[in-house]
């Protein structure tokens, strides 16, 4: 099914361009993804504001600019196989699934995972594999990955995740507790290079599972 962009989604994409997002495929994915479908009806009127919003269980749907920025970084390697840590509402997965052939996504909160699966199915996005589990551990049996995106802030870079990167692959992850930075970690053989992208604010990446 070919998505039809709403005026609100198109306006959001334009505002992201003005904010510095330049990848046309990312902007098109934002324009074609109905963000209101990833929120409770009571928050639907705020869907196209450039702000993070609550989705329950102490979690949030990320600010659209950050979703687009992290996606833009991921696409630098032209990945075919991507791992997302923190499915959350499913919005970031919806953007990624329009842009990469294979997406694997892990969520530790069962109720959020169930809702996200239903939303993504309604959008006819079928190139996504879901796992209920601890994001700190990744999904090693499906790796290695060309890119890994983490949508919650880790206190440090998880060794388990960098070990699941393919050679030349990148990990995009917010790191820190009070002060957080978005990092791009690139694997080259047995070595890893870390670059700071910008200051950010995310909910914490928590160990374990929650039914």
From Swiss-Prot:
Enzyme Commission designation: 2.1.1.77
Described function: Catalyzes the methyl esterification of L-isoaspartyl residues in peptides and proteins that result from spontaneous decomposition of normal L-aspartyl and L-asparaginyl residues. It plays a role in the repair and/or degradation of damaged proteins.
UniProt cross-references to PROSITE patterns, sorted A to Z: PCMT
GO cellular component terms attached to this protein's record: cytoplasm
Keywords: Cytoplasm, Methyltransferase, S-adenosyl-L-methionine, Transferase
Active-site residues, Swiss-Prot/TrEMBL: 62
Protein's recorded name: Protein-L-isoaspartate O-methyltransferase
Top-rank taxon, per record: Bacteria
GO MF annotations in UniProt: protein-L-isoaspartate (D-aspartate) O-methyltransferase activity
InterPro entries: PCMT (IPR000682), SAM-dependent_MTases_sf (IPR029063)
Keyword flag Signal: no
Catalysed reactions listed for this entry: [protein]-L-isoaspartate + S-adenosyl-L-methionine = [protein]-L-isoaspartate alpha-methyl ester + S-adenosyl-L-homocysteine
Family: Belongs to the methyltransferase superfamily. L-isoaspartyl/D-aspartyl protein methyltransferase family.
GO biological-process terms attached to the record: methylation; protein modification process; protein repair
Location relative to the cell: Cytoplasm
